[in-house]
Amino acid sequence: MLDFEFKSRYGIDDLLKIMKILRSENGCPWDKVQTHESIRTDLIEECYEVCEGIDKNSPEMLKEELGDLLLQIAFHTQIETEQGNFNFEDVCNDICQKLIYRHPHVFGEGEKKIKADTEDEVLKNWDALKKASKQQNTYTETLESVPKTFPALLRGEKVCKRAARAGLPINSAEDCIKKIQEQLGELSRRISLQSEDKGELSEHFAQNQQILGEILFDFCNLNRILKNDGEKALTYSTNRFIMAFRAVEDDIIKQGGSLDKLSGDELNRAFNKVISGM
């Protein structure tokens, strides 16, 4: 007989019990054979779907997606519980301990009370405590600790921010833009030379990739200086491009045409006309 109490409303303990049942010998054939690796992508997808709920300003969608993300946390925790490494209470305890330790301006008492009246002071404090708790002896280690699994744009911006907090000279936006313009000029020069050169394509690819990477990294630094979120900026522009593309295609279809029947020049003119008016 199934040892589970059906209710009109459930809580976190019920979720943990459901996961335990699903992973048990008589549980779900799919759930009980999953590993951290097999559901790793699911975890990433749920994080992005939570972000979509935020971007759409939809409380209902956000509630659902946060639930799906919580399921992933419970799933991974149950796997570790079965292996005797840690359980959900351990996870909650660790994050509570971390929050208390990293907020001495709120939870500190006596000599442990630290003054932090501004956002910058809080972040500076947070970084110092994080560095100490992770036994990072050098600033380079703080840069290396930014996960390599992060999207490249996000990782680049985080590295730039941490380098700046370590005392790296803060360039002005104008200096950063000038550097980007110089690199674009160098890229243009290389492409011109490559069009005349009969050398290996792989060599040209490596050269272009290197300088494009440097340009993108400098854009990460520019985002930091301007206090801009590169992910949001690129998402906005990508969405704007799709909207413009749809408008162009809809207009062509109304005229009885088709995108694949237009020349490149005709399509570019139509696209530029739409996007300039947005």
Where are these regions (language model features)?
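Flexible "arm" and connector segments at domain edges
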Residues: 1-65, 71-278
